[in-house]
Amino acid sequence: MDVLIESTRDFEQDLEQFSNTEKFKIIKKLNSYVELLSIDKNLFYKHSAQLRNIRLKENYDSSIYSLRINENLRIILTIDDDPIFERTVITLFRAVKAKDAAKAYNSVAETLYQDFTIENQEIEVPTC
């Protein structure tokens, strides 16, 4: 299955805060995770976490994850399988400091799921 990566304006603005060298390292690490996703999704998910238990209407599952890039950086993204076009779509929403990941995650979740959420409950997730 092909993987399509999309990024939001917020993600692009977050990246601008980094030097070119740091950006290169971030993108390189992200690409290694994308490759891992296409080979073995379970291994990919070991490097990511859902920071909030989000129950959606109609038995939909939340697709938001916090991906550990390094000790201090997380990328907030969604991973959606598109069976019609036989691809996985990754949307990059934010690149934030680890300490700000929960806040960014919640903000993205509230924006994406405002009309679909039936119950929100924050959960404690160990750092991945």
Regions found by a protein language model. Name each.
Residues 30, 34, 38-41, 69-71, ...:
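Generic secondary-structure microfeatures
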